Curated annotation (Swiss-Prot):
CDD domains: cpn10 (cd00320). The lineage of its organism: Bacteria, Bacillati, Bacillota, Bacilli, Lactobacillales. This is Co-chaperonin GroES. Together with the chaperonin GroEL, plays an essential role in assisting protein folding. The GroEL-GroES system forms a nano-cage that allows encapsulation of the non-native substrate proteins and provides a physical environment optimized to promote and accelerate protein folding. GroES binds to the apical surface of the GroEL ring, thereby capping the opening of the GroEL channel. It comes from Streptococcus gordonii. One of its GO terms (biological process) is chaperone cofactor-dependent protein refolding. GO terms for molecular function: ATP binding; metal ion binding; protein folding chaperone; protein-folding chaperone binding; unfolded protein binding. It comes from the Bacteria.
C-alpha cells in the first residue's frame, strides 16, 4: 500500500465510460475535473514555526480534483493518482 508524504494524497479515480456513435470514450478525457475516492493521506505540512497543519481530507472522502493534476502510480494491479492537497478542489458530500 502507498503511504503518501507531506501534503500528498493518494486517490482512486472513478472512471466513467461514454458512448458516442458506438465508440467508447473515456469519461474523463474532456472534463476539467475528475471525481475520486481518497485512499490515503499524508501527515500534512509544517509551517515556518514548525506547527503541523493536518490535511483537510481523510481516507474514504469523495473529492473533486483537477483533471491534469498529479502523477499516476501503480501498486500491484491497481492504478492510483498521487496529488498535492492543493489540487483537490472540493469534498463531494
Amino acid at each position: 500500500m502507498l503511504k503518501p508524504l507531506g501534503d500528498r494524497v493518494v486517490l482512486k479515480i472513478e472512471e466513467k465510460e461514454e458512448k458516442v456513435g458506438g465508440f467508447v470514450i473515456a469519461g474523463n478525457s474532456h472534463a476539467a475535473t475528475k471525481t475520486a475516492a481518497v485512499v490515503a493521506v499524508g501527515q500534512g505540512v509544517r509551517t515556518l514555526t514548525g506547527e503541523l497543519v493536518a490535511p483537510s481530507v481523510k481516507a474514504g472522502d469523495k473529492v473533486l480534483v483537477e483533471s491534469h493534476a498529479g502523477v499516476e502510480v501503480k501498486d500491484g494491479e491497481e492504478t492510483y493518482l498521487l496529488v498535492s492537497e492543493a489540487n483537490i478542489l472540493a469534498i463531494v458530500e
